[in-house]
């Protein structure tokens, strides 16, 4: 169930072991969050170091044997893709280099045009099509079929003609993504008031509810990969913020700060790792009983506006829906970005205290001129906000993806609350991911490939019924 990277990898693996495979896909095209991503995947090389690094990232929330299995299997990711005909390029290393053994982490992606994720997805889709694996599109799964012994023997889907039942002669693999677009689950498990999302709107927690109904335990429900983003009426998904990334290639684009909804600056903007940005914005004020940083505002000047798009419009669900202007002027005309000739007037436009915002910008500018920032921002990035006009855009903690879902073991078997495998049920991908409190860039796609192969292999080896 699910036709993204995890589902496609599992299907390819099972097919190549002579299993008969049918895939159910909720949308018309498939791709899920894979196609909306930047396409990087982990492929560990120093295995012992990678195990230590990922164990530290998990903070004890993922058993050691599962991490070891992930590392060993993910070390085959490049080899496996190359064996299918893909061309691979290096992408980088650890996204949290301050954590132990970070040098062991390497990331790669499939070479090609597009955002990286689409390239990987198109390659895997072609492999599925090449094998003539049946894919039932626009057929969301509704429930798992369980016999009186507790074994999963099929799945019920629904298409335009009504409900259909698919008998599983060996097993069912759930690879249907997370709950980025399910408000009920987000309110139950995630902190803060609002988490918008960048990826596939079809990710509404279907696999979580279906697996719970047949007795699955769940884990990592409060774990996410969450950068900053901007949300506008008329778009189901948010746009990924780009300022911190843009700054690296243009020093003039450093003239920006983050302020809360009262106008106070609260963080070194460049110290935040992209996937962990959300954690700085879900602070709850126990005196005012509110989340003062939801929304926050990015304040910047004309030099930043001229430096390029302030969003990453080549990834996320909006990438084929809207093309952001290169100089941000169209979005200013839409009032998505507010502008004013002075900071005080800008504060009035966005409805925050002009004294606080003015002081925040003045204090930041003093630090720039003295090369000594109050929040410790690197002196090389201290460019004063002083070239009018001035701009503001609201920003929220957003989701690349959630990590929670049915708990699984090192063999990709989905477990009940007592740690016992539910017969005939496997999981792969971000649904019940192994990632816990801290996330490594490319870790989910690395997991889609690694546990997709594990799930496909083990499901194919199940005794037929």
Stretches with model-predicted labels:
Residues 1-2, 158, 168-169, 174-176, ...:
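Short, well-ordered coil/turn residues at beta-beta hairpins
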Residues 208-210, 217-349:
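An anion/pyrophosphate-binding glycine-rich loop and adjacent beta-alpha core
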């Amino acid at each position: 169930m699910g036709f993204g990277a995890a589902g496609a990898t599992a299907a390819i693996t099972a097919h190549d072991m002579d299993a008969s495979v049918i895939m159910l896909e909720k949308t018309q095209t498939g791709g899920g969050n894979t196609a909306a991503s930047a396409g990087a995947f982990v492929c560990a090389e120093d295995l012992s170091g990678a195990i230590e690094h990922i164990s530290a990232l998990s903070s004890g929330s993922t058993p050691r044997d599962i991490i070891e299995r992930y590392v060993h299997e993910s070390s085959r990711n490049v080899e496996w893709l190359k064996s299918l005909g893909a061309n691979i390029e290096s992408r980088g290393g650890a996204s949290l280099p301050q954590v132990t053994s970070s040098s062991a982490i390497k990331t790669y992606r499939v070479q090609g045009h597009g955002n990286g994720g689409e390239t990987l997805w198109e390659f895997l889709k072609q492999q599925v099509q090449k094998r003539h694996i049946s894919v039932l599109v626009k057929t969301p799964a509704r429930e798992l079929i369980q016999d009186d012994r507790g074994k999963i023997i099929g799945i019920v889907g629904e298409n335009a003609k009504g409900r259909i039942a698919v008998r599983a002669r060996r097993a069912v693999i759930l690879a249907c993504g997370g709950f980025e677009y399910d408000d009920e689950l987000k309110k139950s498990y995630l902190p803060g008031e609002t988490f918008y999302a960048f990826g596939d709107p079809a990710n509404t927690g279907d696999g979580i509810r279906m697996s719970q109904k047949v007795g699955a335990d769940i884990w990592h429900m409060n774990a996410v990969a969450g950068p900053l983003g901007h949300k506008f009426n008329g778009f189901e998904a948010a746009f990924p913020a780009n300022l911190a990334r843009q700054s690296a290639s243009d020093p003039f684009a450093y003239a920006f700060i983050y302020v809360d909804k009262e106008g106070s600056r609260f963080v070194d903007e460049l110290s935040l790792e992209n996937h962990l940005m959300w954690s700085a914005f879900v602070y709850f004020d126990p005196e005012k009983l509110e989340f003062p940083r939801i929304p926050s505002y990015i304040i910047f000047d004309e030099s930043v506006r001229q430096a390029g798009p302030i969003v990453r419009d080549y990834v996320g669900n909006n990438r084929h829906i809207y093309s952001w202007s290169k100089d941000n002027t169209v979005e200013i005309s839409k009032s998505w970005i507010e502008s004013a000739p002075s900071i005080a007037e800008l504060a009035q436009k966005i409805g925050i205290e002009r004294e606080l915002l003015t002081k925040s910008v003045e204090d930041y500018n003093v630090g720039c001129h003295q090369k000594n920032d109050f929040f410790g921002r690197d002196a090389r990035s201290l460019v004063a906000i002083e070239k009018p006009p001035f701009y503001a855009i609201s920003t929220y903690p957003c989701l690349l993806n959630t990590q929670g879902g049915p708990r699984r073991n090192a063999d990709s078997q989905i477990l009940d609350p007592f740690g016992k495998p539910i017969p005939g049920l496997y999981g792969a991908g971000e649904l019940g991911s192994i990632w816990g409190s801290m996330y490594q860039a490319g870790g989910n796609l690395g997991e889609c490939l690694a546990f997709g192969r594990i799930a496909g292999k083990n499901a194919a080896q199940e005794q037929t019924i």
